[in-house]
């Protein structure tokens, strides 16, 4: 009788485990895709998803309709390099050494020997470690020397210019 009881319990445990496996797979959530659009000199209502009637932005309108819009975002600096460093690292510009100062050294122009310290962990590195494909299109402005470029920061693609339009 004792052997039957043990076998019965083992059988019940196997059945419960078999029933639980599909539930565990169903609980796995698919990772979302996302695109961060970071623009210089763009007013809140300058594009369609945020109310512009003066500029047609059909692709941005579609992305906003199918995705998620964030409406309370504040930059940490009024110039590009410090604010980009904050977006990429999650740190204040002063913390990463790219803050604007009275000498106007906040923006990293081509040929500048400074840049975002390679030891800083960026959002691209965190995402890449979690299986995301990462990349940047457009103005980098966090240093144009080889050690500062996003290709050395584990971004998979780079299509960047170092000039302003």
Protein language model features and the residues they cover:
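Formylglycine-dependent sulfatase
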Residues: 2-4, 10-19, 23-160
